[in-house]
Amino acid sequence: MLDLKFIRDNLELVRENIKNRGLKLELDLLISFDDERRKLITKIGELNALRNENANAMKDNIGDSSRHYLIEKGKALKAEIMDLEERLGYLTSRLLVEHKRIPNISAPDVPVGVSEDENVVLKVSGNIPKFDFKPKDHLEIGIHLDLFDFEKAREVSGNKFYYLKNEAVFLELAMINFAFSKLKAKGFDLFITPDVAREFIVDGIGFNPRGAESNIYKIEDTDKYLVGTAEITLGGYYYNTILDLKSPLKMAGLSHCFRKEAGAAGQFSKGLYRVHQFSKVEMFCFCRSEDSDRIHNEFLELEEEIFIELEIPYRVLNVCSSDLGAPAYKKYDIEAWMPGRGENGDYGEVTSTSNCTDYQSRRLKIRYKEDGQNKFVHMINGTAIASTRTLIAILENFQDAKGGVRIPKSLVKYTGFDYISPKN
């Protein structure tokens, strides 16, 4: 969350930022709650001082009538303080709810836009494949090659689930190993993370775990949720910790990701593109404030490097204000070319990386020492490999006229094969 003092000192900036993000929030309500809370704290302090004076007066050698008066006065002060403290508790709770709704300030170079259509293309890389046949989409390819089964998954688990089969199993594991090997060489600590997190961690990272807007699954009768990304569990790893940050602390975590994907439908969401469960290798970094922009750009470069080595055409987007998540100061998306997407092929999102500055660390109480003072760390996240969408891009870009699929050279040492042959 933003520092409350910063909000009060920069009301017009915060108000404009809320507007640019397409949100309707009652900033004045937040300020009114804070104003009343401050007055109550002052009033309670004054009443406690009077109560102490009253208690000290009772220690003197006084008559019965005076003592009775002081006793009654003490009771009245206690009752008034209790009433005000109850009001203070209510206000503090309401203040926190409104405070959490305020999004991070956007970076100066974030484009202002009302929808994802106003994301700005920064770069296009790779050659879009030219086929001398009509390319199939991944769903048709995968069923023909016996790589996945949606029908059986629908019977067993419901819509938007799938079984990976045969070579697709090796291909997913190969993508994960490829990403982990690269990140290990870049100095990341590697993790396989829990797939479950407590509500205060989910909330601290900035995911809304409750209500109709929630995109993650709650485990019934607990305070736990299935994670939508390892960003949640990696970000929570150092909850309530003061770090010794001599250099940026980089982590990479593999997790299953669970998403409700409520309302997602249409041809662009079919097959593996938008599902309830998938595997993902996530990058994460805790760093000093002066390092976060540099690390964010390094994460983008790493994501690009991965897709260059996978030989997949892609483009980089500077995500516009209304498409930013609340914690993000700035976000880049990479979209891979998918020949089977739409009528003539199109780009589809495969990675994102966000600099969340100290927005998450304030909630999670993750700090570092500098010049004898505790400061909130900056937190950066990014996708290394999201298995399902990367699999889509591989199947669709490397299909051939015979109905088979070539494996990218960078994955062959992990798969043990370089081609998926058509089934007879």
From Swiss-Prot:
<keyword id="KW-0648">Protein biosynthesis</keyword>
<dbReference type="InterPro" id="IPR015866">
    <property type="entry name" value="Ser-tRNA-synth_1_N"/>
</dbReference>
<comment type="function">
    <text>Catalyzes the attachment of serine to tRNA(Ser). Is also able to aminoacylate tRNA(Sec) with serine, to form the misacylated tRNA L-seryl-tRNA(Sec), which will be further converted into selenocysteinyl-tRNA(Sec).</text>
</comment>
<feature type="binding site">
    <location>
        <begin position="229"/>
        <end position="231"/>
    </location>
    <ligand>
        <name>L-serine</name>
    </ligand>
</feature>
<dbReference type="InterPro" id="IPR010978">
    <property type="entry name" value="tRNA-bd_arm"/>
</dbReference>
<dbReference type="InterPro" id="IPR002314">
    <property type="entry name" value="aa-tRNA-synt_IIb"/>
</dbReference>
<keyword id="KW-0067">ATP-binding</keyword>
<dbReference type="Pfam" id="PF00587">
    <property type="entry name" value="tRNA-synt_2b"/>
</dbReference>
<protein>
    <recommendedName>
        <fullName>Serine--tRNA ligase</fullName>
        <ecNumber>6.1.1.11</ecNumber>
    </recommendedName>
</protein>
<feature type="binding site">
    <location>
        <position position="383"/>
    </location>
    <ligand>
        <name>L-serine</name>
    </ligand>
</feature>
<dbReference type="InterPro" id="IPR006195">
    <property type="entry name" value="aa-tRNA-synth_II"/>
</dbReference>
<keyword id="KW-0436">Ligase</keyword>
<comment type="similarity">
    <text>Belongs to the class-II aminoacyl-tRNA synthetase family. Type-1 seryl-tRNA synthetase subfamily.</text>
</comment>
<feature type="binding site">
    <location>
        <position position="282"/>
    </location>
    <ligand>
        <name>L-serine</name>
    </ligand>
</feature>
<comment type="pathway">
    <text>Aminoacyl-tRNA biosynthesis; selenocysteinyl-tRNA(Sec) biosynthesis; L-seryl-tRNA(Sec) from L-serine and tRNA(Sec): step 1/1.</text>
</comment>
<dbReference type="Pfam" id="PF02403">
    <property type="entry name" value="Seryl_tRNA_N"/>
</dbReference>
<dbReference type="GO" id="GO:0004828">
    <property type="term" value="F:serine-tRNA ligase activity"/>
</dbReference>
<feature type="binding site">
    <location>
        <begin position="349"/>
        <end position="352"/>
    </location>
    <ligand>
        <name>ATP</name>
    </ligand>
</feature>
<dbReference type="GO" id="GO:0006434">
    <property type="term" value="P:seryl-tRNA aminoacylation"/>
</dbReference>
<comment type="subunit">
    <text>Homodimer. The tRNA molecule binds across the dimer.</text>
</comment>
<dbReference type="InterPro" id="IPR042103">
    <property type="entry name" value="SerRS_1_N_sf"/>
</dbReference>
<keyword id="KW-0030">Aminoacyl-tRNA synthetase</keyword>
<dbReference type="GO" id="GO:0005524">
    <property type="term" value="F:ATP binding"/>
</dbReference>
<keyword id="KW-0963">Cytoplasm</keyword>
<dbReference type="InterPro" id="IPR045864">
    <property type="entry name" value="aa-tRNA-synth_II/BPL/LPL"/>
</dbReference>
<dbReference type="GO" id="GO:0016260">
    <property type="term" value="P:selenocysteine biosynthetic process"/>
</dbReference>
<dbReference type="GO" id="GO:0005737">
    <property type="term" value="C:cytoplasm"/>
</dbReference>
<keyword id="KW-0547">Nucleotide-binding</keyword>
<dbReference type="InterPro" id="IPR033729">
    <property type="entry name" value="SerRS_core"/>
</dbReference>
<feature type="binding site">
    <location>
        <position position="275"/>
    </location>
    <ligand>
        <name>ATP</name>
    </ligand>
</feature>
<dbReference type="InterPro" id="IPR002317">
    <property type="entry name" value="Ser-tRNA-ligase_type_1"/>
</dbReference>
<feature type="binding site">
    <location>
        <begin position="259"/>
        <end position="261"/>
    </location>
    <ligand>
        <name>ATP</name>
    </ligand>
</feature>
